[in-house]
Amino acid sequence: MNRSTPVFNSQAAHTFKFPGVISHNNQSPTAGMTCDHLIKWPDRASLKGKFCSYLAGVCGSSSVVIQNVNAGNKSLDHSEITFRHLAFFCTIYHLHQSDRTDAHSPLVQVKTFPDTGGFVLYRKNADVGIEHKLQHQNDSLSCIPGCSLLSIKSALTLFPSNHSSHVSPAGVMIRVRPTAITSTRFTFSGNATAFGSLTAWLRLLRNTVVSIICLLMWICLVYIHCGIDAGICQRDIRL
């Protein structure tokens, strides 16, 4: 993951720690593997996996497709990824795997498929949070609330490492259950507010009512003015 990527504060559903190595379809992983990998976990309690140089993976009861574009880098140690395994729609995560000796980070694509045991209505661009933790450092990065999946995709771009001697960052990825207020709406003042928020709706209603009242008053004034002018003209004609 990129160090320059902003941090998004969210609550985790499930945390999958990576103490071991994920195998490809119960087979031993091969070094330099760059193709897509389909991993199925028969047991819902199997919540273990690991990012490594030849295979990037996430585990859960759902099936996962993992694509490691550049498999020449070292492993991303002590990383954690969280997401809800009961998903109705597919969700694609774009992550970065850093190497202290390489200036560029390979792109890792993780795609979750619907679970056959049940489903929760998820939207493709529902809120996703990413939290970075650098090894040997206790200071947490600042949090920026709220970001759509598309924004995170655009933010996670390849970025050269300015400090090659630093330890590769480990991170936590959080998948949040979308609700009726996950969408955003821009008010007249230009501020993005939560769609469905009472304050935002009251502000929007107030602005709309004020605009309508002003428009009606202007129409009435114009109508009265035109009526007075028409009456004066008719009186002048009669005289």
From Swiss-Prot:
Q: Where are the transmembrane segments?
A: 208-228
Q: Which UniProt keyword terms apply here?
A: Cell inner membrane, Cell membrane, Conjugation, Membrane, Plasmid, Transmembrane, Transmembrane helix
Q: How does it sit in the membrane?
A: Single-pass membrane protein
Q: Can you say where in the cell this protein is located?
A: Cell inner membrane
Q: Name one GO cellular component term.
A: plasma membrane
Presence of keyword Cell membrane: yes
Keyword Cell membrane on this protein? yes
- Name-wise, this protein is Protein TrbH
This protein's species is Escherichia coli (strain K12)
Q: What is the lineage of its organism?
A: Bacteria, Pseudomonadati, Pseudomonadota, Gammaproteobacteria, Enterobacterales
